[in-house]
UniProtKB/Swiss-Prot annotation:
Belongs to the alpha-IPM synthase/homocitrate synthase family. LeuA type 1 subfamily. This is 2-isopropylmalate synthase. Pfam families: HCS_D2, HMGL-like, LeuA_dimer. It comes from the Bacteria. GO terms for molecular function: 2-isopropylmalate synthase activity; acetyl-CoA C-acetyltransferase activity; manganese ion binding. Residues 395-514 are annotated as: Regulatory domain. Keywords: Amino-acid biosynthesis, Branched-chain amino acid biosynthesis, Cytoplasm, Leucine biosynthesis, Manganese, Metal-binding, Transferase. The keyword Cytoplasm applies. Its main location: cytoplasm. Its cofactor is Mn(2+). Residues 5-268 form the Pyruvate carboxyltransferase domain.
Length: 514
């Protein structure tokens, strides 16, 4: 019988720690729904004790997700664990994931605790977590730099207290594949009760080896859970990439001999959603989900693929969710045709009101753009879902701008503030700068623009532009996304979306690491 590899997604927790990737509750819910549709085994929805916002997001996701196990991180203390348990109460299936640092450096410099104190606190934490669930995970933070004898003692102790998953962390991405794989193997061999728990790997990508280290932990070490994120999202250089782990194991089943339960056709749609929400653009040559992942420029390669796809393609683009860039609808298409195409794309809206609003946006786009592609429809629905779920303090109404060679462009933006229309006018170094200045002339947010990027949703000169802006204020970083065939209008929408997030403030109370 083939072993199953458990996929533990931590996009909503560890992925969110990437500077600028902070998500609203509504955005987390949208991603969680996609992860469930992808059949992810465990969704780490956040860190309940870190903020009221994270608690609420976990609590809501726990009530909505039915087919995946929902998890919350908790430090090794009763208060954090109680908070996690309270947040997870609505879940069909839940896990508490508790952690404490075990490396000499972390114990001395960060925790200011002796090894004996850490050992006792780890055991007590797992014992307390078991009062709420028999699904308890323990992580020794900075495990790859911990003393082997001490690490074995701690892990033996927490397994004795009832930990069912032991997660070996390479917190700073210091490991190399053979070393890390042997670390997991040695732990499993030396700990007398290791057979009572599933071993897991959690690797960071600081040296570009997160995926390789994770796979070594599986093949050499015998781990049967991989902790990962969509697009490898995470602080510093990121985390282990879910899509790369899944497709490596599926494509090379002859080597790994493992099964994963993931619906791989949901990988690309989920990747695009995470990229849109966080503002982190996927590099074109990124494995599996990059725009060039299945592109062939070499004439020899193109000829080979045309004759037989498996000459240069080891997996099929459609198997991971890439769809042909085809024209599907036009301005004469009706609501039923639009709804049917959404169903074919596996896209759902929460209410008839959202469907009607999305259809009106589609009709508006069709009047301005002769060719409507699947990607346009997905962008419309994503934008509508975001607008329906976010609280719109500011709302874009209209834009006019004028520019001539040798003169500074002028922009006039009409938008509403809590339902009351205001008009901002300003000049700038370009039409986009003038537009954002016009908005700021009325808002006066005092924020700093950290990022402005534009991507074409489809090909051709009529393509919709997708603009991402990242704003910073008082140490808080937010993203906003806007789409429109007019790049300047898309920029205004993105900026206003970011301002709405700044307006609904939810700061983290406690730092989180693993």
């Amino acid at each position: 019988m083939t072993d199953k590899l458990i996929i533990f997604d931590t996009t909503l927790r560890d992925g969110e720690q990437s500077p600028g990737a902070s998500m609203t509750k509504e955005e987390k819910i949208r991603i969680a729904k996609h992860l469930e549709r992808m059949k992810v085994d465990v969704i780490e929805a956040g860190f309940a004790a870190s903020s009221n916002g994270d608690f609420d997001a976990i609590h809501t996701i726990a009530g909505l997700v039915k087919d995946s196990t929902v998890c919350s991180l908790a430090r090794a203390n009763d208060k954090d664990i109680q908070r996690a348990a309270d947040a997870l109460k609505p879940a069909n299936s839940f896990r508490i994931h508790t952690f404490i640092a075990t490396s000499p450096l972390h114990m001395e410099k960060k925790l200011r605790m002796t090894p004996e104190q850490v050992y006792e606190q780890a055991r007590l934490a797992v014992r307390f977590a078991r009062k709420f669930t028999d699904n308890v995970e323990f992580s020794p933070e900075d495990g790859s730099r911990s003393d082997m004898d001490f690490l074995c003692r701690v892990l033996e102790g927490v397994i004795a207290e009832g930990a069912t998953t032991i997660n070996i962390t390479d917190t700073v991405g210091y490991g190399v594949p053979e070393m890390y794989g042997n670390l997991v193997k040695t732990l499993r061999e030396r700990i007398p009760n290791s057979d009572k728990a599933i071993f897991s790997v959690h690797c960071h990508n600081d040296l570009g080896m997160a995926v390789a280290n994770s796979l070594a932990g599986v093949m050499i070490g015998g781990a049967r859970q991989v902790e990962c994120t969509i697009n490898g999202l995470g602080e510093r250089a990121g985390n282990t990439s879910l899509e790369e782990i899944v497709m490596a194991v599926k494509t090379r089943k002859d080597y790994f001999g493992l099964d994963v339960g993931i619906d791989t056709t949901q990988i690309v749609p989920t990747s695009k959603l995470v990229s849109q929400i966080t503002g982190f653009v996927v590099q074109p040559n990124k494995a599996v989900v990059g725009a060039n992942a299945f592109a062939h420029a070499s004439g020899i390669h193109q000829d080979g693929v045309l004759k037989a796809r498996d000459t240069y393609e080891i997996m099929r683009a459609e198997d991971v969710g890439w769809t042909a860039n085809k024209i599907v609808l036009g301005k004469l298409s009706g609501r039923n045709a639009f709804k049917q195409r959404l169903q074919e794309l596996g896209v759902s809206l929460d209410s008839e009101a959202e469907l009607n609003a999305a259809f009106m946006r589609f009709k508006d786009l069709a009047d301005r753009k002769s060719e409507i592609f699947d990607e346009d429809i997905i962008a419309i629905v994503s934008q509508e879902s975001a607008l329906a779920q976010e609280q719109e303090h500011f709302k874009f109404v209209s834009l006019s701008q004028h520019s001539e060679t040798g003169e500074q462009p002028h922009a006039k933006v009409v938008f509403s503030v809590d339902g009351k229309e205001v008009t901002g006018e300003a000049r700038g170094n370009g039409p986009v700068d003038a537009t954002l200045n016009a908005i700021e002339s009325e808002v006066g947010s005092g924020s700093e623009l950290l990022l402005y990027s534009v991507n074409a949703i489809t090909t051709g000169t009529q393509a919709q532009g997708e603009v991402t802006v990242r704003l910073s204020k008082s140490g808080r970083i937010v993203n906003g996304v806007g789409t429109d065939p007019d790049i300047v209008a898309a920029s205004a929408k993105a900026y206003i979306a970011a301002l709405n997030k700044l307006h609904s403030k939810d700061d983290k109370l406690n730092p989180q690491r693993s």
